[in-house]
Amino acid sequence: MTQKSIHPKWFNDTKVYCDGKHVMTVGSTQAELHVDIWSGNHPFFTGSQRIIDTEGRVEKFMRKYNLQSNNDKQSKLEV
């Protein structure tokens, strides 16, 4: 016996948005998907390098290990 009503609703034409622009259509359990990165702007696929630090992880690492970034060193030299 199979159980009824246990599977999520499936949308064949889910629109995927990146930076407010429609970038592709896929199948999903949600009607719309909003993403920060997709294959059209990911550094691996575009060949460009971009630092993605949305939550301050670089600063947290620098503080944790008492390291200074180049900007901090330059500002201290100017003083």
UniProtKB/Swiss-Prot annotation:
Gene3D superfamilies: Ribosomal protein L31. Transmembrane segments: none annotated. InterPro entries: Ribosomal_bL28/bL31-like_sf, Ribosomal_bL31, Ribosomal_bL31_A, Ribosomal_bL31_sf. Part of the 50S ribosomal subunit. Binds the 23S rRNA. HAMAP family: Ribosomal_bL31_1. This is Large ribosomal subunit protein bL31c. It comes from Gracilaria tenuistipitata var. liui. The lineage of its organism: Eukaryota, Rhodophyta, Florideophyceae, Rhodymeniophycidae, Gracilariales.
